[in-house]
From Swiss-Prot:
A GO molecular function held by the record: RNA binding
Tagged with keyword RNA-binding: yes
Gene: hfq
Domain Sm positions: 10-70
Name the record gives this protein: RNA-binding protein Hfq
Species this chain originates from: Moorella thermoacetica (strain ATCC 39073 / JCM 9320)
PANTHER family per UniProt: RNA-BINDING PROTEIN HFQ
One GO BP: regulation of DNA-templated transcription
Family: Belongs to the Hfq family.
Length: 84
């Protein structure tokens, strides 16, 4: 696996967090959570919904759907240029 593939999840979550993009997170049990991603690490995502924070374990997440499109290609290019 190359480095870009390994960081796709972090890239996606970081863009959502930075842009305060509202998301719906679907859990493996079918439950839906709506809010804004405030932070994440290797194992968890922190979601802010109506002023309340929830820590969700990534192994419980099925799908993350942003309310607006996320341009990962532009973000990936910007990060690559910043490294040069």
């Amino acid at each position: 696996m190359n480095k870009t593939q390994g960081n796709l999840q972090d890239l996606f979550l970081n863009v959502l967090r930075r842009d305060n993009t509202p998301v719906t997170i679907y859990l493996v049990n079918g439950f839906q959570l709506k809010g804004v991603v405030r932070g994440f690490d290797n194992f968890t995502v922190v979601l802010d919904a109506d002023g309340k924070q929830q820590m969700i374990y990534k192994h419980a997440i099925s799908t993350i759907m942003p309310f607006r499109p996320v341009n990962l290609m532009a973000e990936s290019r910007a990060q690559a240029e910043a490294k040069q």
